A protein has these predicted regions:
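The Walker A (P-loop) glycine that initiates the GxxxxGKT/S ATP-binding motif of P-loop NTPases
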Residues: 9
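A glycine- and Lys/Arg-enriched "phosphate-lid" helix/loop adjacent to the NTP-binding pocket
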Residues: 102-168
Length: 185
């Protein structure tokens, strides 16, 4: 079975660039669900979904959809014949964001975080030098820092050792990720 590694962190920390570079180097990667949802909606001409977070009428249903999509990624990886898999965000990210937005949830949301386990959780810290707001990233840098703290707390709450990836060039970060995983084997 593939070793499952989550790359997480607040908005604008370089997760997508890191996952994309790992993929270019031949590693199997699952990309951020919200980005996929946004791209699909744009393809279908659904302007209300260009920024899904801004148009959510039922936050619980939206988060349920995100959770199910992340569970599907997790389950899909079980079928792969590869040694490792990287995820741009994991199942507990859904809970962390619900905590950030002060949304309640029940065991429907907590059970997957307890039962579907990743082998490693790598956290990219806030990095003001690369942080930019855009059409998909609406949070301020201070909000990104708060989300980072909630993400770290949430993963630790579910028993994960969270390993921070230092700021650096994309090449340095890729090498650090691969070194950490090689040491864990």
């Amino acid at each position: 079975m593939a070793k499952r590694t989550v790359i997480t962190g607040g908005p604008g920390t370089g997760k997508t660039a890191l996952v994309t570079e790992l993929e270019k180097q031949g590693h199997y990667c699952y990309h951020e669900i919200i980005r996929q949802m946004t791209l699909q909606a744009k393809k279908e001409g659904n302007q209300a979904m260009v920024n899904p977070l801004a148009f959510v009428k039922d936050p619980l249903a939206f988060n349920r959809m995100l959770l199910q999509a992340r569970i599907a990624q997790f389950e899909d990886a079980s079928q792969l014949q590869v040694s490792s898999v990287f995820y741009d965000r994991g199942i507990p990210d859904v809970l962390a964001y619900m905590d950030y937005f002060e949304q309640g949830y029940d065991s429907e949301f907590t059970q997957p975080s307890q039962n579907l386990r990743y082998d490693a959780v790598l956290l990219l810290p806030p990095w003001e030098a690369i942080y930019q707001q855009d059409n998909e990233r609406l949070e301020s840098f201070d909000q990104a820092c708060e989300i980072h703290d909630i993400l770290e707390s949430c993963y630790r709450q579910y028993g994960y050792e969270v390993v921070a990836i230092k700021p650096g060039t994309l090449k340095q970060r890729v090498n650090e990720v691969l070194d950490i995983l090689a040491q864990a084997e």
